[in-house]
């Protein structure tokens, strides 16, 4: 699931994905965070 959080590295997405979806599996794709459940 892509969330509306800008990123330059996957590490920036981990807290955002954890807060949004309760998962720490995250990637940064095209400058946006993508969370995996």
UniProtKB/Swiss-Prot annotation:
GO terms for molecular function: ion channel inhibitor activity; potassium channel regulator activity; toxin activity. One of its GO terms (cellular component) is extracellular region. Reversibly blocks hKv1.1/KCNA1 (50% inhibition of current at 1 uM). Seems not to be voltage-dependent. The record marks 36 as: Aromatic residue of the functional dyad. The keyword Secreted applies. Disulfide bonds join 7-28, 13-33, 17-35. Belongs to the short scorpion toxin superfamily. Potassium channel inhibitor family. Alpha-KTx 02 subfamily. The record marks 27 as: Basic residue of the functional dyad. InterPro entries: Scorpion_toxin-like_sf, Scorpion_toxinS_K_inh. PROSITE patterns: SCORP_SHORT_TOXIN. This is Potassium channel toxin alpha-KTx 2.14. Expressed by the venom gland. Has the structural arrangement of an alpha-helix connected to a beta-sheet by disulfide bonds (CSalpha/beta). The lineage of its organism: Eukaryota, Metazoa, Ecdysozoa, Arthropoda, Chelicerata. Negative results: does not block hKv1.4/KCNA4, hERG1/KCNH2 and EAG/KCNH1 currents, at 1 uM.
